[in-house]
């Protein structure tokens, strides 16, 4: 059993509707979507391989941001180690391979990826992108919105508490009295 090293990329571009992720159709298949990736050539790093594969497979230029994670998986009986990198879309390039590409939202990409490990890589990318844009990761947006709503309700309820008069004729809220 052989072991080989690959470089892969999660390429994203920011749109008004949020980040969109690049997926390419897997070689020799129909409607199986994957991240661009390929075998590390001699005298090449995994990051350089990932950049090359993005250009060759998808016809996209990208700017590396950081390494995401390494994934070990079995492919055609051999183990491969894939180092994934987060990359930002930087324009079009001339593709060397005839593959279909798709730019998908987080939810669409999760649905399109069939490997659990690829989904984990996408979740890591989404988390990092959301930190950089100030936007919450997709799966936490509802939870955060509910927390903000609950906080708003509590603050609103505190504002409705009756005020009491102090000896000097000024009013004090119950919040200040409880805190003081």
Language-model regions, residue ranges each:
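Flexible domain-boundary/linker segments
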Residues: 26, 67, 71, 102, ...
